[in-house]
Regions:
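Active-site metal-binding core of divalent-cation-utilizing nuclease and nuclease-like domains
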Residues: 29-62, 208-231
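Gly/Pro-rich interdomain helix-loop hinge
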Residues: 80, 84, 90-213
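A structured, charge-rich N-terminal accessory region that forms the first stable segment of a protein
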Residues: 1-33
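Active-site-adjacent loop/helix micro-motif of nuclease/hydrolase catalytic cores
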Residues: 75-84, 258-262
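Short, aromatic/basic amphipathic alpha-helical patches
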Residues: 27, 121-129, 260-264
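Short, flexible loop/turn elements at secondary-structure junctions
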Residues: 60-62, 72-75, 89, 114-117, ...
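Polyanion-binding interface signature
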Residues: 170-264
C-alpha cells in the first residue's frame, strides 16, 4: 500500500541521521535523486508523514528547506494534490513552522514518487522531480543484503516491475488487453505515438477508466467547441472489451441535453 511505501521511503531517508551506519549512503543517494545535489557531511533531517495530508514532508535541518513527497503505488495524482499541499506549506503558523524546524520564506521542492506504471496523467503532474519505480530500484539495489527490511521491499518492487513489464508485452499474451490498462495504454501508444501529443492538450492524450471491472482506454483525436454555445463535440478512439475480446471503436460525442427537444 501507499502508506507502507511511505514508511519505506522514510526508513531509507532517516539513515542520514546515523552517519556511522552502512545504510547512510543510501539516504544520501535517495536525497540526491530528490534534487539535493550536494549533501554535506553532518546534514540531518526530519521526516513527517501525513502532515496536513501530505504523504511525506522532509525537513532539512538548518537549511530552511523542505521536500514535499507525493507518493503513489498504482493510482495517479488527483485534484491537483501537489499544488494544494504546496500552497498549504506557505500558510503555516509560527508553531507549525517551529515543529518542522523551518522559518518564513521556506524553500520548497516537490517530488512525485510513483513505483507503478506512468500513464499520461502522471506525466502532467506539476512536480519539480519525478521518481519512478525503476529509479528507486536502481537506488536501492547496491544495498541489497544489508537489511532484511530493505531486502523484503526490494523483492516486492522487483516483482511489481516485472509484472508491469509482462503487461506491456501483450503480444506474447494478447488476452492481457482484456484486463490490463497498462497493456491497453501500450497498444494505444503504438498506434498513436506520444510525439502527436502536446502536453496540456486533450488531443492524443491517453485516458483510462473502468466499467464493471473491465478497463477501457480512450484518446480524443478531434474536438470542436461552438463559439457562441457551451457545447461542442469530440471524436475519439475507445479501446474496450466484451465477450469476444478487445476491440477498438471510433466514437462521436456531443454533450447535448437529451431531454431538451430543441437541442435534439
Amino acid at each position: 500500500s501507499e502508506l507502507s511505501q511511505d514508511a519505506v521511503i522514510c526508513w531509507c531517508l532517516n539513515w542520514l541521521n546515523e552517519p556511522a551506519s552502512n545504510l547512510y549512503p543510501l539516504a544520501v543517494d535517495l536525497l540526491r535523486k530528490m534534487g539535493e545535489v550536494t549533501v554535506e557531511s553532518g546534514q540531518t533531517l526530519q521526516t513527517i508523514q501525513q502532515f496536513y495530508k501530505t504523504d511525506i514532508l522532509i525537513c532539512l535541518t538548518g537549511k530552511n528547506r523542505v521536500i514535499l513527497v507525493e507518493d503513489k503505488t498504482d493510482s495517479s495524482e488527483h485534484g491537483e494534490q501537489i499544488r494544494r499541499y504546496r500552497e498549504r506549506m506557505t500558510q503555516l503558523s509560527e508553531e507549525e513552522r517551529r515543529l518542522c524546524g523551518i522559518h518564513e520564506n521556506v524553500e520548497l521542492r516537490t517530488v512525485y514518487f510513483k513505483t507503478g506504471f506512468l500513464y499520461d496523467a502522471d506525466r502532467l503532474v506539476d512536480a519539480d522531480v519525478t521518481i519512478t519505480g525503476e529509479a528507486f530500484l536502481q537506488c536501492l539495489t547496491p544495498y541489497q543484503g544489508k537489511s532484511e527490511i530493505l531486502d523484503a521491499y526490494l523483492t516486492f518492487l522487483e516483482r511489481k516491475l516485472e509484472q508491469q513489464a509482462r503487461e506491456k508485452d501483450f503480444l506474447q499474451e494478447p488476452e492481457r488487453l482484456n484486463n490490463s490498462a497498462i497493456a491497453q495504454h501500450t497498444l494505444m501508444r503504438m498506434i498513436f505515438p506520444e510525439t502527436l501529443w502536446k502536453r496540456g492538450s486533450v488531443l492524443y492524450e491517453v485516458y483510462h477508466g473502468s466499467s464493471f471491472g473491465r478497463p477501457w482506454t480512450e484518446m480524443v483525436i478531434a474536438e470542436y467547441l461552438f463559439p457562441t454555445q457551451k457545447d461542442g463535440y469530440r471524436i475519439f478512439w475507445r479501446m474496450d472489451s466484451d465477450q469476444d475480446g478487445t476491440y477498438l471503436s471510433l466514437r462521436f460525442y456531443d454533450p447535448y441535453n437529451k431531454k431538451d427537444a430543441a437541442e435534439k
